[in-house]
Amino acid sequence: MTASTSVAVGCAVGIPVGVGIIIAVCFWFNLQKRYKREEQDDRELERAIYDESGFVSFDNFGPLRDSKDEAALASSELKNPDHTSGSSEGSAHPEEKDGKSRDQEKPLGKKNSKYYVPAYRRKINLLQVRNNNYGNNARQKSVVDLPSINNSSNVSLSSSQRHITKRQISVYDQMVPVISDEGPNFFADPSSDTNTSNDQNKASMIELKHNTRQSSNENLIRNLQNQDFGSYYPRRASSSFLNGNISNASFHTRNSSITSVNKRDALEDVFATPKSAAQSQLPNTFDKDNEGMDADHSVKDSRSAITDKDKDLYKLQNNYDVGNIGEIAEEDQYENEFTNYSQSKREFIESLRPK
């Protein structure tokens, strides 16, 4: 009783498991075959993609025509006899050629397959088959057009190449060459005058560069001479056009701040810092041309005398006072005898102290 039960259980469990394992093994073998076939197709696809003469060209628009037109063209070419050939193919029966055309039509048609093939892969395979057919047709045509075997000794390489179809353009044929402007011209006819013309062109270019550099240097020197680099705090534009001698002196030395005071007919700037009231007491003969260094010393003496008399008068120490003409002192443009900030500050501090 127990034996029959164990046998029944074993059969009930073992038979379905065994059948399932067998089915799984069959599916696995089929899947492996499919994988191998797909790997082979992928390798062919990669070879077709990386073939530069098959895809990167301008002559492969013919294979994109319809398969019916392709078959009609092939049949018309086979039906027309070749009068130039000396072989027996030109006198063949039309039925044999129709059979050949049918054999050629079969690879171009769609093949029924029980496996699913993607559209892009079918298109690539069709293009590859058409390219192969084109190569075979061209090879057959070149063989037919060759002279007979008796005259094969007179056949040259050029005559055989004349019947070969037009080669496909590769990637390197599509590259645009770029030629530099300088250097010899490759498209010109070689002559003895080219060297002399190149030498003349080089000499003219060197002379032109030298002239432009010299003119730029002259402009730089002229602009530097027109600048007044000696003025410490310029209140107006450069006055080198008023007196050329003073501008040259200011260009070569720092003492232009001294000579700028002696400029003739110098206009007073209204927007400059107001000068002290003691400057208005200077003699009018200071600006005359006939006075030299003696006049300067006399003006200094008179200035010192006036300042001694008016000690209580605030005097602005800046470059525009004749008393401190030998020194350069920084100034406050907003401080004068009317707005004495330092004195006001001092008075304010004194007012804060306790009385």
Curated annotation (Swiss-Prot):
Gene Ontology biological process terms from the UniProt entry: fungal-type cell wall organization
Gene: SKG1
Predominant place of localization: membrane
Name under which the protein is recorded: Suppressor of lethality of KEX2 GAS1 double null mutant protein 1
Extracellular side: 1-8
Modified sites of kind Phosphothreonine: 273
Organism: Saccharomyces cerevisiae (strain ATCC 204508 / S288c) (Baker's yeast)
Its membrane topology: Single-pass type III membrane protein
Role summary: Plays a role in cell wall integrity. Affects the cell wall polymer composition in the growing region of the cell.
Topological domains annotated Cytoplasmic: 30-355
Region of interest: Disordered: 70-114, 281-304
Keywords carried by this UniProt record: Cell membrane, Cell wall biogenesis/degradation, Membrane, Phosphoprotein, Signal-anchor, Transmembrane, Transmembrane helix
Family per record: Belongs to the SKG1 family.
UniProt keyword RNA-binding, yes or no: no
Localization: Cell membrane; Bud membrane
Residues with the Phosphoserine modification: 142
GO cellular component: cellular bud; cellular bud membrane; cellular bud tip; incipient cellular bud site
Biased composition (Basic and acidic residues): 92-108, 286-304
